[in-house]
Amino acid sequence: MEPPGDWGPPPWRSTPKTDVLRLVLYLTFLGAPCYAPALPSCKEDEYPVGSECCPKCSPGYRVKEACGELTGTVCEPCPPGTYIAHLNGLSKCLQCQMCDPAMGLRASRNCSRTENAVCGCSPGHFCIVQDGDHCAACRAYATSSPGQRVQKGGTESQDTLCQNCPPGTFSPNGTLEECQHQTKCSWLVTKAGAGTSSSHWVWWFLSGSLVIVIVCSTVGLIICVKRRKPRGDVVKVIVSVQRKRQEAEGEATVIEALQAPPDVTTVAVEETIPSFTGRSPNH
């Protein structure tokens, strides 16, 4: 009895399938080393262009046209707002750094064709993000609160350092470098409220009537002085006018007396000779 034809061994194929050949070829090419065309070895002041070396442009210039067999590199200056700091073979210049005032920045060194701008902090700000010699972001100085003193002022790299006032001292606005001592109460006054590190002692008189009496007395004195002052001034003026008038009249009298001619009256003098004739000395 012969076995059925389906039970026999599979027939042998001497030719491999097409898929197997493709796989072998793929693995062969995948493992093969890849060779790229070698770039020319150029000097430090040259840059490669294809298989040739061209001279680099100076700082502040870019390549406008690469060199040829008979021509050198054509360079042109960088436009405003751009720069190149080194010898280069670049076709475009680099954009200058912008210092944004909204970030508290200002240009500590302006941009030129050969140097990039360097940003620093605006006055009243300190740097919070440092990038080499360039500051990328700044922040405003902290403000000391009332009751604090400025222990150390802010710098371009450090914020303001604040410190609380010790007991018995105060700082009204936080801008003082040293806190002030609070006033001590005397026996005439009493403390209306406890002094804090941010406010001074508040003092009031013991009796409100004393304040009223002083104020009323002062106001009354001022009113009396103002009322009497004009009357006294009038009296002074009258007395002064009368005195001047009297002085003027006296001076006029003296002048008239000096200018008047002298009043001379001639009196005849009769000479009498005593007669002793006929009289004896006994009479």
From Swiss-Prot:
Chief location of this protein? membrane
User: What GO terms describe the biological role, i.e. biological process, of this protein?
Assistant: adaptive immune response; cell surface receptor signaling pathway; defense response to Gram-negative bacterium; defense response to Gram-positive bacterium; immune response; innate immune response; negative regulation of adaptive immune memory response; negative regulation of alpha-beta T cell proliferation
What's the impact of mutating Y61F?
Does not affect cis interactions with BTLA
Query: Where does this polypeptide localize?
Result: Cell membrane
Q: Does the keyword Repeat apply?
A: yes
Q: Where are the TNFR-Cys repeats?
A: 42-75, 78-119, 121-162
Q: List all topological domains (Cytoplasmic).
A: 224-283
Which tissues express it? Widely expressed, with the highest expression in lung, spleen and thymus. Expressed in a subpopulation of B cells and monocytes. Expressed in naive T cells.
Disulfide bridges in this chain = C42-C53, C54-C67, C57-C75, C78-C93, C96-C111, C99-C119, C121-C138, C127-C135
Q: Which GO terms describe its cellular component?
A: external side of plasma membrane; plasma membrane
What's noted about domains in the record? The cysteine rich domain I (CRD1/TNFR-Cys 1) is required for interaction with BY55 and BTLA.
The name this protein carries in UniProt is: Tumor necrosis factor receptor superfamily member 14
Species name: Homo sapiens
What are the top taxonomic ranks of the organism? Answer: Eukaryota, Metazoa, Chordata, Craniata, Vertebrata
